Amino acid sequence: EVLKQKGYSTAIFGKWHLGSQKEFLPLQNGFDEYYGLPYSNDMWPFHPQQGEVFNFPDLPTYDGNEIIGYNTDQTRLTTDYTTRSVNFIKKNKNKPFFLYLAHNMPHVPLAVSDKFKGKSEQGLYGDVMMEIDWSVGEIFKALRELGLEDNTLVILTSDNGPWTNYGNHAGSAGGLREAKATTFDGGNPVSYTHLTLPTTER
């Protein structure tokens, strides 16, 4: 909202999870564009504990304030979010913009597009991470081609630690103790890095 007041074009593509009623959706909270899922990609009728523990309704996909479908094929999400992000950057190359790209992957259930399926030789989780790496590369490619790389702050961060009760397909905490849903180092720390620092001040 602050950036929008300063004349920035704003967009979020991906996971929102800050409320799914209309007044809580992105377009009512500072964003010009929104495409994605309103909450976690596992909150749908195909959850392995559906009926036993959960009773999730169909999972909507939003474009702006409109629901455009339910239970979207999740193998498309990373590519769809990336395509929209690149198009947003190109459309706003001559003005300030704020892009929030919040991939649903690698949150379970994992899904990967056909072009990356089996490509990592490290299983499904490896394929998913490879596609996310490709996505980051596409963002940088667009910034470079438009001459915006030196005038854009890019921050890469992640969610909590891995959900190890889903097995090794949900990631690894490496040598850190425990995982998601604990207060130990394997669950709470969030990785962060700034990949670029603008060379000009605004």
Where are these regions (language model features)?
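Single conserved hydrophobic/aromatic residue that forms the stacking wall/gate
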Residues: 194-202
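Formylglycine-dependent sulfatase
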Residues: 1-195
